[in-house]
Curated annotation (Swiss-Prot):
InterPro entries: Rootletin-like_CC. Residues 74-120, 151-251, 327-384, 417-1879 form a coiled coil. It comes from the Eukaryota. May be a myofibrillar protein. It comes from Onchocerca volvulus. Residues 1-29, 1969-1983 have a biased composition (Basic and acidic residues). The keyword Coiled coil applies. Keywords: Coiled coil. Residues 1951-1968 have a biased composition (Polar residues). Residues 1-39, 1944-2022 are annotated as: Disordered. This is Major antigen. The gene is OVT1.
Length: 2022
């Protein structure tokens, strides 16, 4: 309050407060912004690209290809998946931004811990302003700071700056830690983004491929559709042509027919056909009808003309008929042909239509198939997923399935599953085939034995040959190893030298890099600082605007809340008012107008609320728009910052990677080629020992599994390669962007240099303008905030005032009406009282006259009346006391009225202020909107530029991606072709393996059956042994040749497999390196390209192998032909064997002997097997030798590492040399710079002196002219502005004084209200006492005794009481005085009510005037605001002009003094010149510093340009290498095509060979069948031999018997010599026997010959068999030994493989080390080249500089000649200048240090200082807010008090009404009491005054009329006995109810007491007593004596009852009666 009284605050204080509030708002806005940025949703730029691509794809598919909806849905799903991934990226970005914001908050908290000064005093405001101006503005304002205070303030600021520097150092440490954390988070974020981008790019690529395939399909379908459409169009055209031709023919036919018909009609004389047709029926004539009728007529004419026509006519008709018949037949035939053709054409059309329908159905089917294929893809993916889950159940838990699966993933999974299922199927097929082969082998074992034997012999021979060949190769390998060792030694020596040079080069390169990095960091730091400053400015502006908007919104929300509260209050008030009006409407219809007014006001309020709501909605919408713009701006800034940082990091990484990769690739290619050659040779030497088929089988099985793994890995590698290529493309794009940014930065640097040079000149002007602008902005902000505050306050006051006025107007109307009614009632009551008084006096006189005898009773009665009168006089005295209080209240009321008038005036003024402020707010809003629109336009332009650039970059990126995709597709196709070739080769290998397995199984089965067949084939082998030996030699030679050919193929395959293993290992490492480093990608790509070259070599080797295999096949064909001839021979031999089987019977014994011989041969074969085992034992040391060779290779690798170390030492030496060279260069550059600086100093000194003099003279003249003009205009404007300002100040002072008066008035109102409450209490007590006194006066009469006194004594006493002026006279009671006092009170009340109504009317008028004045005030306020703005501008211009005037005056003074001193003393002039020279030198020093900075920047730019040139060279090399690789790829494609052709030829040849082999197998089967037949024949022959042996035994027996018979015969001859007959018979018989014996002997001879022949043949066969068995045993032994050797070799092979794996691992590690070393070497070489180039450039620069120095020397000489002349003049000055220069140097140093410190503080700690100031401003804002809250609280208190006052006023009004009611009730009650008392007295006096009851009734009526003026609550008498002379108030107690005062006032309503419950009209006890008295009077008097008070009184105006006067006087009494009735 005191501050408000003091008047307006000073300008400085206002500006300081405004800056503080603004800064607090900045901080609040910043906090809000920090809070708001938590919900940032970063939309990655890839969302728009993916969506755009998806949309374009959808449009193409819909328009061109009519793509199905299912595919579009799938595409949309993919795009949604991509957008979801991008949203995940955006969420990650938002999370990181939140973390950054948390770090910022931590910074704020840490900085909040700094010391903040409490700004409690007024001096702090000035200090704050100085701080802000010192920090923010480069100069100090001349108004506020004097020259004396300036150094003190500088010292204070320096101290504060030192304190802040100490605090900032602590904060820097924390900032560094936080920055490290931020960098770590950024790196993690970058890794995550790269992974996501890689995944996204793979998906995009797969998606594009799928789209391409689908587009290709759709194009094919489209081409088919076009073709079908063309065919349909052609068919249609053909049909149309045919139809037209037929139609023409048909028309011709019809015409012909019609002509014939016409001829017939004419001849017959009948009517025409057409007339018949038209006459017969009204049918239309058509061609069909003509034909039909013509045919009918033909028939009819033929039928009708027959009997009539004559013979001549018959002949003619016959001729005509014949002709007509021919024509008719032709016509019918043509018609039928035309019909057929039409039918055919229709059929064709139908066919074409059917074709179209079929094509459409095919299209639908294709679409359905597409949908089914997509569903099938999904099902396949589910099946594959289920398969993978089933496959992985044992190993791991199933991974969660994806919601949406792209086709590439389905294809991959299906491939994987198909490969796995194919592998499983292959395994099962192998098993089945093995089973089938076993079954077939069991049947065909005999056929394969001979071939296996021959092969084994050939292999054994070839193995021996290979052993010798390998021994030779081992010797060669030893020689090569020795050569390699020598080379390694030399390489180690070179390595040592190279290492030393490399170390030296690395050190030098490190130094150069540090220098380059430092320069780059400086440039980047500067650029980042500039960007940060711009961003900070933008953020500050946005924060300011957002803070302003938030404040607006908060104010609007508060206003809305207030409006809601006021609306609720208004609603409650309206409800109360409506209730009151409802009650009033029942009585008075005139109050309807008031209700209508209230309704109108309510509608106006509702409209205003709606308008405010609309305003609030508009403000919220504006705020939302601004918030969205701010969010978008923040997102753009954050995205730009991130992109800048990422681009910088990527640029550094790319530069490094390119430098490394470009060098490493060239070296690695050469080295890898050499190493691959060396490795291939070494591996060939090692792998030539592995020449056996079983090992090949195992290896091939393993290779198949590995190939499947490799395929999977190749698929993964393809994806990885694609991702890497995508990354490379992104890196290229980033490189391009980085180059563009570098160019932009270079341009920016040039521009900045120019701007710096321009800004140095324009700095002073800019500083002054900035000061003016800052002052304007501050003033505008101060005024804006002040206006806002005033507006809010005024709006609140206005609302409260409006509400109060409305309430008061309503109440005034009510009170006016009530007063009018009360006046009418009072007038009527006064008339009635007067009449009653007259009647009463008349009746008293009559009673006095009638009762002279009753003198004593009258005395007693008079004594009673005397006492009563005394009592009433005391009460009147008390009423007179309250008159003073009432007068005081009236005076207070007058004061209040005056205050109300003042408040109304203040309200009017406030309304004016609010209107003016609203106008100002509208202007400010417009300005802000214009600024916001400008900012929006700028942001839109920036965004459009950014989008355009981004679209261009995206297009370039897309083009590059497409080119890369094309290259990738080509490479994939090539890889697929290579894989197919590999698969074919693998299939071939698998087929050969299967055949080998088959043959092996057959050999095993045959080995089992050989033992069984040995005995049977002995004879066969004897014959075939010679041929077998011959064949063995041939087969051995062929087998050796084959083994020789197979060994290199085997070695090459192993080398390929090892190469594949190496590839796998290298690719695995590449994958691991790719995750962390992108640099190794290109190296791995080149490595893969080298491996592709190796693959090409392998393919060439395979071609050579194919050639060898072809030669082998030719040899095998020749061998097969020879074998066929041999088989033919064997067949002939077998035929001869069939003939010789008979001889086998006799050859058993010889066979047994031969078996023994064969056993011996078996022993020999066992011995041969042992020899072979010894040979294998000899091979084992060769394997040991191979192991030793591996160890030697390991040693060689170690030697290579040592050589690498030597090379590093050489590199160190070279680096040292480079360091020395760089030191020399630096020294030379220092000398050169010194020379340049000296030359430039001299030049600048000369030019500066000239320019300075000219410039200063021009500036002085221009400044003088400007100052004069400005001074004139400023004075004119100042005068006008001062006048307007003074008027404004007077108005402001008036407003402030009014506000102070209003506040004082409120205080006085509060005090008066308290006083009024106290007075009300006093009045209440007084009324209570009055009632008690009246009750006492009434009750005294009961206890008076003295009826016997005379009337004379009574009169005397009466006279004495009236005359005595003593204290006794106070005890008198005069009713007339009381009536007069009451009437005065009533008149006073009426006057007050009238005044109140007048005041209300005045308030209404004032309100109307205030509403009208608002418009005027608004207009005036706008005028005032314009005037104030003009005044502010004028003041600012005045200040600037004053500054200029001051500076100009100073300059003029200095010039005047200089002129005077020049005139007076030359020395004075020299001193001034010296000062100018010192200033010039200082500026020259600054210019030198700037020039040095420019030079450094130029150097940095030159270095950057050199680096860019190097990068361009690297890129050109890379492109050349790329073209070279593309050419190589083309060559590879041609070679792969040749390989494919060769493979196809080879397959055809293989198929032909397989057919030949099958033929041979069939032939062998035939031979085997023949052998089986031979075996059967042999068995049969054996059986025949056995039978022959049995016959021979029988014959021998018969011979023995015959010999016995002969002996018996001889005995019988001796005995029976006498019997001649018997002898003759015996002789005959003997002759017969002899003949038979001869025959038998001849047969035996034949048999012997045959047997001998067979024996010989059998012997031969047995010999062959024994040889074969021996060979077989030998072969079996060999096989066993070979199996043992194979098993041993397998074990050895496993060991060797383990060693090889270890060696490969070691080799890989060594290769990685070698690669690293090679990379380092390549880097060093490139760096060395760069250093050499730089050194050459430096030498060139040095030469150019030397030339320049020479030129400068010449110029220097000329300048020296010029300066020599000036030196003579300057020698005298130099002595004085040296001291001044020293001082100036020190001052310059100090100033530079201060400037640097200030700049550092501003750059590094500006934000923190701003935060500190913001904190201080927050404190000020808190203080201001506290003041505001206090003010608001005070206003609320005032409002509450006003409300309470209004409520009290209402209560007082209610109390007045209640008092009236109470007066009426008291009158009524007093009347009843008086009636009761008088009735009692009358009953007592009936004895004496039986004839005079009217006097007592008259007296009772007078008392009743007197009592009707008073209304009081119920009273109870404490005791029945008391002293009448003592007024004991304690015994008469007023009992209040338990309700609060808010619910009733002064006893309104029913009240509960301790003794009785009474109504407002009177107590029930009195009613009871009154009724008792009435009943007594009626009983004693006979009826109506006591009821005369209710009788009518005759008067002049008519008759009127007292009960009506008591009951119908007031509205409140009617309400009370209604309550009683209810």
């Amino acid at each position: 309050m005191e501050k408000a009284r003091e008047g307006a605050p000073s300008k400085e204080r206002r500006s300081a407060e405004e800056t503080i509030s603004r800064e607090t708002r900045h901080e609040i806005a910043g906090n809000d912004g920090d809070i708001g940025t938590d919900n940032i949703e970063y939309i990655d730029s890839m969302d728009s690209t993916g969506l755009g691509y998806g949309r374009t794809g959808e449009g193409i598919s819909r328009i061109l290809y009519e793509h199905p909806r299912d595919e579009l849905i799938n595409y949309k799903r993919r795009i949604d998946a991509n957008t979801e991934q991008q949203r995940e990226h955006a969420d990650i970005m938002a999370a990181l931004q939140r973390k950054i914001e948390e770090y910022r908050r931590r910074f704020a908290e840490i900085e909040g811990r700094l010391v903040v000064h409490d700004l409690n005093e007024s001096g702090d405001l000035v200090n704050m302003k100085l701080k802000e101006e010192w920090l923010l503005s480069p100069k100090i304002k001349m108004e506020e700071i004097s020259d004396v205070d300036f150094p003190n303030q500088l010292e204070d600021e320096r101290r504060r700056a030192e304190d802040l520097a100490i605090q900032l150092q602590q904060e820097r440490l924390q900032n560094d830690q936080l920055q490290s954390e931020i960098q770590r988070l950024r790196q993690q974020f970058g890794i995550c983004i790269r992974d996501k981008e890689r995944i996204y790019q793979t998906r995009e690529r797969n998606f594009t491929r799928f789209l391409g395939e689908e587009q290709r399909k759709m194009m094919e379908l489209w081409s088919e559709l076009q073709r079908v459409r063309k065919q349909c169009a052609e068919y249609r055209e053909q049909t149309e042509r045919d139809l037209e031709n037929q139609r023409n023919e048909f028309i011709k036919v019809i015409r012909h027919v019609s002509g014939i018909v016409r001829g017939l009609n004419i001849e017959n004389g009948t009517h025409t056909l057409l007339s018949d047709l038209s006459s017969e029926s009204g049918v239309e004539i058509t061609q069909d009808t003509v034909l039909i009728e013509a045919v009918k007529r033909f028939h009819e004419s033929q039928q009708q003309t027959a009997p009539v026509i004559g013979p001549e006519l018959i002949t003619e008709l016959r001729l005509a008929r014949a002709e007509d018949a021919g024509l008719h037949d032709e016509l019918m035939r043509k018609y039928e042909e035309s019909a057929k053709r039409i039918i055919e054409l229709e059929a064709r059309d139908d066919e074409s239509h059917n074709k179209l329908v079929a094509l459409e159905s095919d299209l639908k089917r294709t679409r359905d198939r597409l949908a089914e294929s997509q569903n099938a893809l999904r099902k396949l993916y589910d099946m594959t997923y289920s398969y993978e889950i089933n496959a992985e159940k044992e190993t791991r838990s199933p991974s969660p399935t994806k919601g949406y699966v792209p086709p590439p993933e389905v294809v991959r999974s299906v491939r994987y599953v198909l490969n796995s299922r194919a592998n499983d199927n292959n395994v099962l097929q192998r098993k089945l085939k093995n089973a089938e082969v076993q079954i077939s082998e069991l049947t065909t074992k005999n056929d394969s034995l001979e071939e296996i034997r021959r092969r084994l012999e050939k292999r054994i021979a070839e193995a021996n040959r290979t052993i010798t060949h390998r021994q030779r190769e081992l010797d060669d390998a030893k020689h090569t190893v020795k050569d390699l060792e020598d080379r390694l030694k030399s390489l180690e020596q070179e390595k040592a030298s190279i290492d030393s040079a490399r170390h030296h080069l690395e050190d030098e390169i490190r130094k150069m890099r540090e220098q380059f990095n430092s320069t780059l960091l400086d440039v980047e730091r500067r650029a980042a600082e500039d960007a940060d400053e711009r961003i900070r400015k933008i953020d500050e502006e946005t924060k300011i605007r957002i803070s302003e908007l938030t404040n607006r919104i908060e104010m609007l929300l508060e206003e809305n809340k207030r409006l809601k509260d006021e609306n609720d209050g208004m609603k409650n008030r309206i409800q109360d008012i409506e209730k009151e009006y409802n009650t009033i409407i029942r009585k008075l219809e005139e109050k309807d107008n008031a209700l209508k007014n209230l309704e109108n006001t309510r509608q106006r309020l509702v409209n205003e609320l709606e308008e405010q709501r609309t305003r609030f909605d508009t403000m919220t919408s504006e705020f939302d728009n601004l918030r969205t713009n701010y969010d978008s701006a923040n997102k753009n800034t954050v995205a730009i910052e991130l992109t800048v940082k990422q681009i910088k990091e990527q640029r550094d990484e790319i530069i490094k990677q390119k430098d490394k990769l470009a060098k490493e690739l060239a070296d690695l290619e050469n080295k890898l080629n050499n190493e691959t050659k060396m490795r291939g040779d070494a591996e060939k030497l090692n792998q030539r020992h592995l020449d056996e088929i079983d090992n090949f089988k195992k290896q091939i099985n393993e290779y198949i599994t590995e190939v499947t793994i490799i395929r999977r890995q190749n698929d993964d590698f393809d994806t990885q390669m694609k991702t890497n290529q995508a990354k490379l493309s992104s890196m290229k794009n980033s490189l391009i962007a980085a180059k563009k940014e570098i160019e932009k930065l270079s341009e920016m640097n040039n521009r900045l240099q120019q701007d710096k040079n321009d800004l140095i000149g324009a700095k002073q002007k800019g500083d002054t303008e900035l000061n003016l602008l800052t002052e304007k902005i501050r003033k505008v902000e101060i005024e804006f905030e002040r206006i806002k505050k005033d507006n809010q306050e005024l709006e609140d006051h206005e609302r409260t005032a409006r509400d109060d006025l409305k309430q008061e107007t309503n109440r005034n109307h009510l009170l006016a009406k009530e007063l009018e009614e009360a006046r009418a009632d009072i007038v009527a009551l006064n008339d009635r009282l007067a009449k009653m008084d007259a009647n009463f006096k008349i009746k008293l006189d009559e009673t006095i006259k009638k009762s002279p005898a009753d003198h004593e009773t009258i005395k007693s009665r008079e004594s009673k009346s005397e006492k009563i009168i005394v009592k009433h006089e005391t009460k009147i005295y008390e009423i007179n006391k309250y008159r003073a209080e009432l007068e005081k209240l009236e005076s207070d009321k007058d004061d209040l009225e005056k205050r109300i008038i003042g408040l109304q005036d203040e309200l009017n003024e406030k309304d004016r202020d609010t209107d003016r402020l609203n106008a100002e707010i509208d202007d400010l809003k417009r300005k802000l909107q214009t600024e916001i629109e400008k900012v929006r336009k700028e942001t839109t332009t920036v965004q459009e530029r950014y989008h355009i650039e981004w679209d261009e970059e995206r297009d370039n990126h897309q083009k590059k991606i497409d080119s890369m995709n094309a290259l990738i597709d080509e490479l994939r196709s090539k890889l697929n072709d290579a894989e197919r070739a590999m698969a074919d080769l693998q299939n071939r290998d698998s087929i050969l393996e299967r055949e080998n397995n088959d043959w092996k199984e057959k050999s095993d089965a045959l080995n089992m059956e050989l033992d069984r067949l040995r005995d049977e084939l002995l004879s066969v082998r004897r014959d075939a042994e010679k041929e077998i030996n011959r064949y063995n030699t041939d087969l051995q030679t062929a087998a050796r040749n084959e083994i020789k050919l197979l060994t290199p193929t085997n070695n090459e395959m192993k080398s390929q497999l090892n190469a594949a293993e190496d590839k796998i290992n290298s690719l695995n490492k590449v994958i691991t390196d790719q995750q962390n480093k992108i640099r190794d990608l290109t190296g791995e790509v080149h490595h893969l390209e080298g491996e592709l070259k190796d693959a090409k070599g392998n393919v060439a080797n395979l071609e050579s192998e194919l050639d060898t295999t072809r030669e082998r096949i030719h040899l095998l064909g020749e061998q097969n032909a020879s074998l066929q001839t041999e088989l033919n021979k064997i067949k002939g031999d077998i035929d001869s064997l069939f003939g010789e089987n008979d001889m086998l019977k006799t050859a058993k014994e010889s066979n047994e002997a031969e078996i023994d011989r064969l056993k011996q041969k078996l022993q020999r074969s066992i011995e041969n097997a042992k020899k072979y085992s010894d040979a294998l034992d000899k091979l084992r040391p060769e394997y040991d030798r191979l192991q030793n060779l591996y160890r030697e290779k390991i040693k060689q690798a170690e030697n290579l590492t040592q050589a690498v170390q030597d090379l590093e030492s050489r590199l160190n030496q070279s680096r040292r040399e480079l360091r020395d060279a760089t030191d020399k260069l630096i020294a030379s550059e220092g000398d050169r710079n010194a020379l340049r600086s000296e030359v430039e100093k001299l030049q600048h000194e000369v030019q500066f002196m000239r320019e300075q003099l000219l410039r200063k003279t021009d500036e002085y003249q221009a400044a003088l002219s400007d100052l004069v003009n400005a001074h004139r205009t400023a004075e004119d404007g100042r005068v006008n502005a001062v006048q307007a300002l003074e008027a404004r100040k007077y108005e402001i002072n008036d407003l402030q004084s009014r506000l102070d008066n209003a506040e004082q008035y409120l205080v006085t109102l509060q005090q008066n209200y308290v006083a009024v409450e106290n007075e009300r209490d006093m009045l209440y007590d007084a009324l209570r006492r009055l009632h008690s006194m009246i009750d006492r006066t009434v009750t005294i009469n009961r206890f008076l005794i003295g009826v016997d006194e005379s009337m004379d004594e009574k009169k005397e006493t009466v006279l004495q009481t009236q005359k005595s002026p003593d204290g006794k006279s106070k005890e008198r009671f005069d009713i007339s005085d009381l009536d007069t006092n009451i009437q005065k009170l009533i008149g006073r009340i009426e006057k007050l009510e009238l005044e109140r109504n007048e005041y209300r009317d005045a308030l209404d008028r004032i309100k109307k005037k205030s509403i009208e004045s608002h418009i005027k005030i608004n207009k005036q306020e706008t005028i005032f605001t314009n005037i104030e703005d003009q005044l502010v501008d004028v003041e600012e211009e005045k200040r600037t002009l004053e500054m200029r005037l001051a500076s100009a005056k100073q300059l003029l003074r200095s010039q005047e003094e200089a002129l005077k001193q020049r005139d007076e003393e030359r020395s004075h002039m020299k001193l001034k010149i010296a000062k100018f020279e010192m200033e010039a030198r200082g500026k020259e020093a600054q210019l030198r510093q700037l020039n040095e900075l420019v030079r450094n920047l130029r150097k940095d730019l030159e270095t950057a340009q050199g680096d860019l040139g190097v990068l361009h060279d690297h890129e050109e090399r890379w492109y050349a290498h790329k073209f070279h690789l593309e050419s190589k790829l083309k060559d590879q494609e041609s070679e792969s095509q040749q390989i494919r052709l060769l493979v196809a030829n080879f397959e055809t040849e293989r198929n032909s060979l397989n057919e030949k082999v099958r033929d041979l197998a069939s032939r062998l089967q035939q031979t085997e069948s023949k052998n089986a037949d031979m075996k059967e024949d042999n068995d049969r022959l054996k059986k025949d031999l056995i039978k022959a042996s049995t016959n021979e035994a029988e014959l021998r027996r018969t011979i023995d018997q015959n010999s016995r018979v002969v002996s018996d015969n001889q005995i019988l001859k001796d005995q029976l010599e006498s019997a001649q007959n018997d002898l003759s018979n015996a002789n005959n018989r003997k002759q017969q026997l002899e003949n038979e014996l001869l025959v038998v002997r001849s047969e035996l001879r034949d048999l012997k010959q045959r047997f001998s022949d067979n024996a010989n043949r059998i012997i031969d066969l047995q010999r062959h068999l024994t040889d074969a068995e021996n060979d077989k045993k030998r072969l079996t032994n060999r096989l066993n030994s070979l199996e043992k050797t194979v098993s041993q070799q397998r074990t050895i092979e496993t060991e060797i493989r383990q060693q090889l794996s270890l060696a490969l691992n070691e080799r890989n590690t060594l290769q990685n080390d070698l690669r690293d070393l090679q990379r380092r070497l390549a880097r060093m070489e490139t760096e060395k080249k760069i250093m050499n180039d730089k050194y050459d450039e430096l030498e060139k620069i040095r030469a150019s500089l030397i030339k320049r120095i020479e030129l400068l020397d010449e110029e220097k000489r000329t300048m020296e000649n010029i300066l020599h002349e000036t030196a003579l003049q300057r020698e005298a000055i130099e002595s004085s200048l040296n001291a001044l220069e020293r001082e100036n140097k020190e001052l310059h140093r100090n100033c530079a240090q201060l400037q640097q410190q200030i700049a550092q503080l501003e750059l590094e700690n500006g934000n923190r200082l701003i935060q500190l100031t913001n904190k201080q401003r927050e404190e000020y804002d808190k203080f201001a807010q506290n003041m505001r809250t206090e003010k608001i609280q005070i206003e609320r208190i005032i409002e509450n008090r006003e409300r309470s006052l209004k409520s009290r006023i209402n209560q007082l009004e209610n109390q007045l009404n209640i008092m009236r009611d109470q007066l009426n009730s008291e009158r009524r009650r007093r009347r009843e009491i008086s009636d009761k008392i008088l009735s009692g007295e009358v009953n007592k006096l009936n004895v004496t005054l039986s004839g005079i009851p009217d006097a007592y009734e008259m007296y009772d009526r007078t008392l009743y009329t007197y009592n009707t003026y008073f209304g009081s609550p119920s009273f109870t008498v404490g005791s029945s006995s008391f002293d009448p002379n003592i007024t004991d108030d304690s015994k008469i107690i007023l009992k209040h109810s338990d309700r609060l005062e808010s619910s009733y006032a002064y006893g309104g309503g029913n009240r509960t007491s301790d003794t009785a419950v009474t109504a407002p009209t009177g107590s029930s006890s009195y009613h009871g007593q009154r009724s008792d008295t009435h009943t007594v009077n009626e009983s004693e008097r006979g009826g109506n004596d006591s009821g005369k008070g209710t009788k009518q009184v005759d008067g002049e105006g008519g008759s009127l009852s007292l009960s009506e006067i008591g009951q119908g006087a007031t509205f409140e009494q009617q309400q009370q009666r209604r309550r009683k009735r209810q």
